[in-house]
Each structure stands twice: as structure tokens, then as C-alpha cells.
């Protein structure tokens, strides 16, 4: 049986806990139960990820070489997706400009769209 290969950009786990980390922890704690999907969880601090999701045959942890978001999005992630023959990738807020597979983009907070008067133009 061929497994679906799903890359998850987990860089948000490298910072302070927030709504995005709660969302990812919740959804992927359930999805990793599906053994027909192989998950590639990527972050700079993979030790933190392994404490959350544990070790299973269908999980691979990938350590980013940098915390720099520009280098990660422009170079590192596209290279990792190609190297691991990823079919789908899940990102938060921003996707790499060079898309090497189908992708899922989650935008968690869109208050700036409903109430632009409360946010600076640069937001």
C-alpha cells in the first residue's frame, strides 16, 4: 500500500505557544492515527515536536537548518519537498513561492479583513 506523504511546516512550535500550535497539535494528534499517511513534521526544534507527537512508524521529523523564514520558504522547504517526494504540504499563513507539490494553507485569524481600521496598513 502506497502511503500519502504529507509535509507539515511546524516552525510555529519553535516559538511561544499560541493558537496556531494548539490547532496543529490537535489536528495532527488525531491524523497520525491514520497509518496510510506518512507525516513529515519540520521545525528547528524537533525535540519539542517529538514530545508532542511521539515516535511512530508513520512520522519523520525534519530539522530545519535555519530559523530564517526567508531562507526556509525560498530554499529549504522546496528542497525538502523534492528530496522526500512529498505529495501534499501544510503551511500556516504563507506558502513558498516555488510550489513542488499540492498544498494546504491555513489562515487562522482574519480579523484584519473584517476590521481593517484596527490594523496598520503593513499588517
Question: PLM features: residue spans?
Answer:
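Carbohydrate transferase catalytic cores enriched for Leloir-type hexosyltransferases
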Residues: 1-123
Amino acid at each position: 500500500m502506497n502511503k500519502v506523504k504529507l509535509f507539515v511546516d511546524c516552525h510555529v512550535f519553535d516559538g511561544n505557544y499560541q493558537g496556531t500550535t494548539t490547532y496543529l497539535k490537535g489536528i495532527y494528534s488525531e491524523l497520525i492515527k491514520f497509518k496510510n499517511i506518512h507525516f513529515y513534521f519540520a521545525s528547528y526544534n524537533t525535540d519539542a515536536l517529538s514530545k508532542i507527537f511521539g515516535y511512530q512508524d508513520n512520522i519523520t521529523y525534519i530539522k530545519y537548518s535555519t530559523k530564517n523564514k526567508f531562507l526556509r520558504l525560498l530554499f529549504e522547504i522546496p528542497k525538502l519537498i523534492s528530496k522526500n517526494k512529498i505529495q501534499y504540504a501544510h503551511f500556516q499563513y504563507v506558502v513558498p513561492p516555488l510550489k513542488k507539490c499540492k498544498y494546504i494553507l491555513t489562515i487562522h485569524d482574519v480579523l484584519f479583513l473584517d476590521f481593517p481600521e484596527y490594523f496598520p496598513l503593513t499588517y
